[in-house]
Amino acid sequence: MQGNLSAWLVKHALIHRSLGFDYQGIETLQIKPGDWHSIAVILYVYGYNYLRSQCAYDVAPGGLLASVYHLTRIEYGVDQPEEVCIKVFAPRKDPRIPSVFWVWKSVDFQERESYDMLGISYDNHPRLKRILMPESWIGWPLRKDYIAPNFYEIQDAH
């Protein structure tokens, strides 16, 4: 079964994969990293101009990393929003996904957090650097294969 957006993407020959619907009836689509930026621009023009959230997670130890975007389209009024969830998977060895900062500015800190915690590099992000961990931190703390150091020192703020 396809949702409205998935049918529209098929009609316009935009490559994606439907991953089904969640309990609220929101469709989840998988987009390849190489197609993500152009599809993001198309979605914005189509009316998905509100990025509700962006997050990332480690799918499995040694497996893929996923960047997840929740988008909303409010066309017929605030009480009837159309929502979609986009998942972009990246290989663990060199996880690179195009940044959508230039499409939705609100993704700034969220992509930085995903970089800081999981090591996903968002290409063309204007300030991609650590946001929660010290710049000297080694590794990506939310990866399932991350080994926490036995000792670390956090310096006092001066």
Swiss-Prot record:
Has the keyword DNA damage been applied to this entry? no
Class of this enzyme: translocase
According to the UniProt entry, what is the EC number of this protein?
Answer: 7.1.1.-
**GO terms classed as biological process:** photosynthesis, light reaction
Q: Which GO terms describe its cellular component?
A: chloroplast thylakoid membrane
Among the GO molecular function terms of this UniProt record, one is:
NADH dehydrogenase (ubiquinone) activity
Q: What Pfam families would the database entry show? A: Complex1_30kDa (PF00329)
- Catalytic reaction equation(s): a plastoquinone + NADH + (n+1) H(+)(in) = a plastoquinol + NAD(+) + n H(+)(out); a plastoquinone + NADPH + (n+1) H(+)(in) = a plastoquinol + NADP(+) + n H(+)(out)
The yes or no answer to whether the keyword Glycosyltransferase is present is no
Q: Where in the cell is it found?
A: Plastid, Chloroplast thylakoid membrane
Q: Which NCBIfam families match?
A: PRK12494.1
Q: Please give the subunit comment from the record.
A: NDH is composed of at least 16 different subunits, 5 of which are encoded in the nucleus.
Name of the protein described by the UniProt record: NAD(P)H-quinone oxidoreductase subunit J, chloroplastic
- Per the UniProt entry, what species is this protein from, by scientific name? Helianthus annuus
What gene is behind this protein? ndhJ
